[in-house]
Every structure is written in C-alpha cells, then in structure tokens.
C-alpha cells in the first residue's frame, strides 16, 4: 500500500539553513519513511538549534519505477526551498536515500535515464544552487557492483528499474559533480546489509575524478541503526557553520 508520498516531516523550523533527510528502504519498503530520522533530528537539534530540519518521501516501487523516485524528491525539496526560504541546503540520504542524493547531484536533464521536461530541469537547478553539504550514509551507488556482491538483491532492483541500463553508474556521472557542495561519505562497520564495497567503489570513483570528499567510517550500528546514531549526529553538527 502506497503512503502519502507528498508528506513532508517537519522536525524543526529555525531559519534559512536546513537539513533535508531522504530515507531508504530499497525503493520498495513502506516501513521506511521520513519518521526514520526523528531521533537523529532530535540529537542534531540539541547542538545545532539554528538549523531547520525536514524529511521528504517519494513514491515506491513496484507501483512506480525509476526515475519517478528522484523526480519526487526534487519536486518536494524544491518546494521546501521556495516555501521555507531555504538559502543553504544540507542533504542527508540513507541507503537508497543516498542513491537519490547522488542522482540529485549528477542527473543530466534530457538524458533518457532521468526525468524529462523543463520543469524538472528548473527545479533540479534550484536544489543544486542551494546545496552546501551532502551526506551519503551507508548508500548504494553501483547496481552492477551491488548485484555482483549480492545477487539476491535483484528482488528489489528489478522492481525499481525496468533495466540496469536505466541506472547511471557513478563512473559515468561523477564528472558532472559541481565544485560547490562538500561530499561526506559515511559507512558503519557493523552494517549487515551492505559491506564497505559500495562505499569503496564510490570513493574510488571520486578519487579517480579528483573530486574532494570526506570519509567517515566507524561502528555506527546495523543498517537500520545508522540514521539514529549519536555519532552520526555529532558528525553532522561538526560540519555545520
């Protein structure tokens, strides 16, 4: 059953600097939602009371497929920027939320693998123009590498994508990363669903393209614990002005 994909979770409204969270759930899991970040947002609020905090959602597969997920995220984030007067945006995505963050950074309007039309291009440009930090937390970045390591994960990949050809690998898209936002790649040693291979794949691509990034690897709990972890909250706060 699909939930209300237009729902935005408001954790804190404090000013024009804002963190926006994107949840995971393998593009298919209704158990993951913007509320995933309630505990993390509360931890961040303790030490960063001037940062507004929101979380958005997106329609799930198999009812819809890529690129609808990224189109929904861009739509909702751009709406927040306009309605809340956000001037400095910090994105944090967990699991496929990190995938979506990467796609927001690198999507090429007009490419068949991404949403079509001038409306998407305009809203994507607005989101990118506001970006300051992007936190990629225990993310999926290469479907090809993912399925080589976890063949059984095709059960959700095949629901979210008509074909692997519809997914642009970071090795193809990294060259379009702008010099603006600071990238943070975060991974938990204890993640039982994703080893470090996805993170290592992405950082190798970033290094090959000489794109600066910050890497934070630590014991941050299991896959569904990372986005509640106090160390992650402390890391985020340390990056904010």
Swiss-Prot record:
PANTHER family (alphabetical): AB HYDROLASE SUPERFAMILY PROTEIN C4A8.06C, KYNURENINE FORMAMIDASE
Protein name listed in UniProt: Kynurenine formamidase
HAMAP family for this protein: KFase
Residue interval(s) of motif HGGXW: 23-27
Organism: Eremothecium gossypii (strain ATCC 10895 / CBS 109.51 / FGSC 9923 / NRRL Y-1056)
Pfam families: Abhydrolase_3
Origin superkingdom: Eukaryota
EC top class named in words: hydrolase
InterPro entries in UniProt: AB_hydrolase_3, AB_hydrolase_fold, GDXG_lipolytic_enzyme, KFase_ver/fungi-typ
Lineage: Eukaryota, Fungi, Dikarya, Ascomycota, Saccharomycotina
Entry EC number(s): 3.5.1.9
Gene behind this protein: BNA7
Family recorded in the similarity comment: Belongs to the kynurenine formamidase family.
Hydrolase found in the keyword field: yes
GO BP, one annotated term: L-tryptophan catabolic process to kynurenine
Entry domain remark: The main chain amide nitrogen atoms of the second glycine and its adjacent residue in the HGGXW motif define the oxyanion hole, and stabilize the oxyanion that forms during the nucleophilic attack by the catalytic serine during substrate cleavage.
GO molecular-function terms, A-Z: arylformamidase activity
């Amino acid at each position: 059953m699909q939930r209300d994909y237009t729902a935005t979770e408001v954790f804190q409204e404090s000013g024009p600097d804002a963190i926006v969270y994107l949840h995971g759930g393998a593009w298919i899991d209704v158990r993951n939602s913007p509320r995933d970040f309630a505990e993390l947002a509360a931890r961040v609020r303790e030490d960063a009371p001037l940062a507004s905090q929101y979380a958005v959602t997106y329609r799930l597969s198999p009812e819809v497929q890529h690129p609808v997920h990224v189109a929904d995220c861009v739509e909702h984030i751009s709406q927040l920027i306009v309605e809340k007067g956000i001037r400095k945006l910090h994105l944090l995505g967990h699991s496929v939320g990190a995938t979506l963050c990467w796609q927001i950074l690198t999507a090429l309007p007009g490419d068949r693998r991404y949403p079509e039309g001038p409306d998407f291009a305009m809203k994507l440009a607005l989101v990118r123009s506001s970006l300051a930090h992007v936190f990629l937390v225990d993310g999926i970045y290469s479907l090809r590498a993912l399925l080589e390591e976890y063949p059984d994960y095709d059960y959700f990949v095949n629901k979210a994508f008509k074909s692997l050809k519809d997914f642009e690998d970071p090795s193809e898209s990294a060259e379009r990363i702008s010099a603006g936002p600071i990238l943070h790649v975060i991974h938990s040693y204890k993640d039982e669903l994703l080893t470090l291979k996805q993170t290592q794949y992405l950082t190798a691509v970033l290094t090959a393209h000489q794109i600066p990034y910050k890497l934070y690897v630590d014991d941050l709990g299991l896959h569904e614990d990372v986005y509640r972890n106090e160390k992650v909250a402390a890391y985020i706060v340390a990056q904010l002005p």
